[in-house]
From Swiss-Prot:
Biased amino acid composition, Pro residues: 163-184, 222-231, 244-264, 292-311
Entry protein name: EMI domain-containing protein 1
Gene that encodes it: EMID1
Disulfide pairings: C37-C96, C62-C68, C95-C104
Cellular component terms per the entry's GO annotation: collagen trimer; endoplasmic reticulum; extracellular matrix; extracellular region; Golgi apparatus
UniProt domain Collagen-like: residue ranges: 179-368
PROSITE patterns in UniProt: EMI
Compositionally biased region (Low complexity): 232-243
Location(s) in or outside the cell: Secreted, Extracellular space, Extracellular matrix
Glycosylation sites noted in the Swiss-Prot or TrEMBL record: T42, N51, N136
Comp. bias (Polar residues): 277-288
Amino acid sequence: MGGPRAWALLCLGLLLPGGGAAWSIGAAPFSGRRNWCSYVVTRTISCHVQNGTYLQRVLQNCPWPMSCPGSSYRTVVRPTYKVMYKIVTAREWRCCPGHSGVSCEEASSASLEPMWSGSTMRRMALRPTAFSGCLNCSKVSELTERLKVLEAKMTMLTVIEQPVPPTPATPEDPAPLWGPPPAQGSPGDGGLQDQVGAWGLPGPTGPKGDAGSRGPMGMRGPPGPQGPPGSPGRAGAVGTPGERGPPGPPGPPGPPGPPAPVGPPHARISQHGDPLLSNTFTETNNHWPQGPTGPPGPPGPMGPPGPPGPTGVPGSPGHIGPPGPTGPKGISGHPGEKGERGLRGEPGPQGSAGQRGEPGPKGDPGEKSHWGEGLHQLREALKILAERVLILETMIGLYEPELGSGAGPAGTGTPSLLRGKRGGHATNYRIVAPRSRDERG
């Protein structure tokens, strides 16, 4: 994109006296501003970043004018926040080496004009260093500086070159105009409107953060003392009746009963038998014919039992009868009183050793430590950052010899690297290296 005229103007600017010094507008009242130099400072700030959500129980108010019998709750999804630490780089203006004071006008007597330039400082940071492979926090600053240089180079490559007015005295061939690269000095003197204003009033206090998350559950406490014995239980239900027992032996004979009353006259006929059957007739004085025999009368009461007869010959033993049916279960009685405790028995002989049991199931895996996981993620991030920095340096060609240094042929290097706008300010970039700890807001 750069033509021969642009290269010629650049070489003429280098040949002018004071070309490697700081830029200056030339105004006498602001000549002290050339002693100011820019420095890159790094700060670590904290910020809240949302990290998931959690459920929160919120008490609902009673919609009725009267008091409600119970409390009601509703579940609300609340965001969870954590604190992230960011490393922010900023540019500050301070006195150049050899100058001091409020306006950087006092020069030290023992110090001379500084011999370094902006390109020299960048050249010191562009030297590749051997990566040791130890991804710890000591390499963060080195990677940050290298990445910062890469971003500055990329910004210069993407800047659109503004048209340069034609200069008739410039040669067409830029090859003979070799020389050291131009040095970028400190920014030029600013006008009155560029003076730093007074600090403003502090801002209002921010809103109160959300309540923190609930802490982890505590450890289980020791078991409490044994309580007093409980009251005795109620009496049990009545059991089913028991089986029916066998029949008892016959009882002894009872005493003789009272004598029976005398029966009717026809009862005495039965003692001598029926006259028709026994061939006996009763003489009667009347000659009337005998009528039919009436129905028999009711049986008389049982007479007294006779005396017991002699004991008979004992009979042969009978066959054993089948067992009777099982009777219903009897009612269970009340439990008796608890007896006294017996004497302790002698210990028995020691038994033989049993067989070895099967191994138990494998336990659950333990929880991983949060510190180890975060350290591993930090190492992976540093490793990826180091690889990307090396790839970018290789693609841009930062380690090729500079134009005019004599280490390479003419025309090498990237001409558009030096297209920085004179008097312009470089864009501030921030490099973030997260280092978090969880917090709920």
